[in-house]
């Protein structure tokens, strides 16, 4: 830079605009989802699911593309394409008469079905979605394994085992609460009986005292009556004795 030349440092306004374009308004790429792997039996059919998320509304120009890479192969070939509301099955490859479109763009679904599976169908299938203006994003891949008989998945077995264990635990918890409820109910009944017995013992002495209080005047009356009777009999005996003396 020559001496006396004006400085070429960026202005603060330009720096703010650059920051806002990079940070405040980041581009959100389209996200595609598929299963990690699917299993199928020879002669059967299998559904390859494909869905996506986009920050934009579903466009009329949305497109789905499926590619297939054989097991052990290097190159992928296009086997299916959906655009302008119409499905197109590629005439190249062994899938041209065995692919069925079952997706619905309105529900962000780009799934296809492959019929009459064969061992040669083993490989990787890639789903690519474009929803203009949202066209930037990664594809998603699903690996197909074809067997003579579809093996039981490890996840299914694990889920069944976990479900069985949870069922046993819930049953034991239910049994525990039933036994506890019956025990508490019995304890409450015994407590009520004991309380009733204690109340009966407290009230019984009071009743006896009242009975004794009512019986006391009767006893005194009987005692006075016996004394008066005894005095009368003594007077009669004394009078008879004196009359006998006078006769003599």
Swiss-Prot record:
GO biological process: cell aggregation; cell-cell adhesion via plasma-membrane adhesion molecules; chemical synaptic transmission; myelination
Signal peptide: 1-29
UniProt-listed InterPro entries: Ig-like_dom, Ig-like_dom_sf, Ig-like_fold, Ig_sub, Ig_V-set, Myelin_P0-rel, Myelin_P0_CS, Myelin_P0_Ig-like
Region (Disordered): 224-248
Bilayer-crossing regions: 154-179
Effect of residue 68 to C: In CMT1B; severe/mild
Membrane topology: Single-pass type I membrane protein
Impact reported for residue 75 to V: In CMT2J and CMT2I
Keyword Cell inner membrane in annotation: no
Effect of residue 122 to S: In CMT1B; loss of glycosylation site
Top-level taxon in the UniProt lineage: Eukaryota
Keywords in alphabetical order: Cell membrane, Charcot-Marie-Tooth disease, Deafness, Dejerine-Sottas syndrome, Disease variant, Disulfide bond, Glycoprotein, Immunoglobulin domain, Membrane, Neurodegeneration, Neuropathy, Phosphoprotein, Signal, Transmembrane, Transmembrane helix
SS bonds (residue pairs): 50-127
Gene Ontology MF: a single term: structural molecule activity
Domain Ig-like V-type residue range list: 30-143
Modification note: N-glycosylated; contains sulfate-substituted glycan.
Family: Belongs to the myelin P0 protein family.
The protein, known as: Myelin protein P0
Lineage: Eukaryota, Metazoa, Chordata, Craniata, Vertebrata
Gene name tied to this protein: MPZ
């Amino acid at each position: 830079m020559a001496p006396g030349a004006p400085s070429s440092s960026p202005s603060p306004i330009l720096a703010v605009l650059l920051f806002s374009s990079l940070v405040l308004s980041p581009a959100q790429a389209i996200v595609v989802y598929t299963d990690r792997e699917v299993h199928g039996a020879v002669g059967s059919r299998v559904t390859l699911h494909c869905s996506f998320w986009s920050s934009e509304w579903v466009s009329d120009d949305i497109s789905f593309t499926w590619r297939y890479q054989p097991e052990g192969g290097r190159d992928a070939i296009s086997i299916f394409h959906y655009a302008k509301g119409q499905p197109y099955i590629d005439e190249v490859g062994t899938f041209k008469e065995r692919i069925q479109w079952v997706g619905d763009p309105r529900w962000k679904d780009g799934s296809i079905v492959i019929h009459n599976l064969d061992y040669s169908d083993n490989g990787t299938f890639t789903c690519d979605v474009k929803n203009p203006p949202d066209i930037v994003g990664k594809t998603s891949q699903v690996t197909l394994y074809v067997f003579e008989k579809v093996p039981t998945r490890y996840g299914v077995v694990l889920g069944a085992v976990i479900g069985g264990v949870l069922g046993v635990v819930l049953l034991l918890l239910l049994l525990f609460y039933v036994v506890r409820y019956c025990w508490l109910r019995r304890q409450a009944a015994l407590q009520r009986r004991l309380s009733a017995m204690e109340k009966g013992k407290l009230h019984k002495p009071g009743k006896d005292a009242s009975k004794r209080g009512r019986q006391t005047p009767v006893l005194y009356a009987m005692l006075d009556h016996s004394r008066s009777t005894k005095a009368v009999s003594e007077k009669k005996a004394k009078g008879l004795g004196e009359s006998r003396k006078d006769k003599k």
